[in-house]
Design a protein with these regions (language model features):
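Charged helix-capping and loop-helix junction motifs
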Residues: 108-114
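Single conserved hydrophobic/aromatic residue that forms the stacking wall/gate
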Residues: 2-13
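Surface-exposed, charge/polar-rich loops and edge strands
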Residues: 78, 88-93, 101-105, 116-161
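Extended, well-folded interaction surfaces typified by the phenylalanyl-tRNA synthetase beta subunit core
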Residues: 19-84, 132-138
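Short glycine-rich anion-binding loops that position phosphate/pyrophosphate groups of nucleotides
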Residues: 26-28, 98-102
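A general structural motif
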Residues: 17-19, 43, 90, 123
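Residue-level signal for inorganic ion chemistry
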Residues: 22, 46, 94, 110, ...
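Phosphate/pyrophosphate-binding loops at sites that engage ATP/ADP/AMP, CoA/4′-phosphopantetheine
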Residues: 11-15, 81-87
Length: 161
């Protein structure tokens, strides 16, 4: 499903983001391909996650022919044909979820890839991308789950206070 960006994400994106980690939508996740096209046209660096061993995540900037169907059937950059970015190089991280709450906690797919990776993104604004229907009263989180800076849905932006 294509995702219409709210003004809130647009403001963060325009001001702060030169190097962005986003994702190739899988299943019912919000599709960010329109944002990716616009960002690429503006000369921004776009990286995508690659799932690795021991539930690790790598940010990879794919080359022109640098895509494959990766683990879990997700469109993924081919590491050997990509530029690898350190987490500290990212300005903005856009994170998918299956559910989120007003405190900006997220529920992912259960493997913890993002929860292990996000603390290393010390310079990045971390924003969850979701549909309003995914908002819950209290997300079922564990001690390792990471709080995001904000969430953007088709209706607006939720910021953690």
């Amino acid at each position: 499903r294509d995702f219409c960006l709210s003004r809130g994400l647009g403001d963060v994106y325009k001001r702060q983001a030169q190097t962005i980690l986003l994702y190739a939508a899988f299943g019912s996740e919000a599709d960010l391909s329109a944002l990716a096209e616009k960002a690429q046209a503006q000369g921004k660096t776009l990286a995508y996650p690659v799932c690795g061993e021991a539930y690790s995540l790598t940010a990879a900037v794919p080359g022109p022919d640098g895509w494959e169907m990766g683990q879990y059937g997700i469109r993924t950059p081919i590491l050997s044909r990509s530029e690898i970015l350190l987490p500290e190089a990212l300005d903005l991280v856009l994170v998918p979820c299956t559910a989120f709450d007003a405190d900006c906690f997220r529920v992912g797919m259960g493997k913890g890839y993002y929860d292990r990776y996000l603390p290393r993104c010390k310079n990045a604004v971390k924003i969850g991308i979701a549909f309003e229907a995914q908002r819950v009263e209290h997300a079922a989180v564990d001690e390792h789950d990471q709080r995001l800076d904000a969430y953007v849905t088709e209706r607006g932006i939720y910021k953690w206070k």
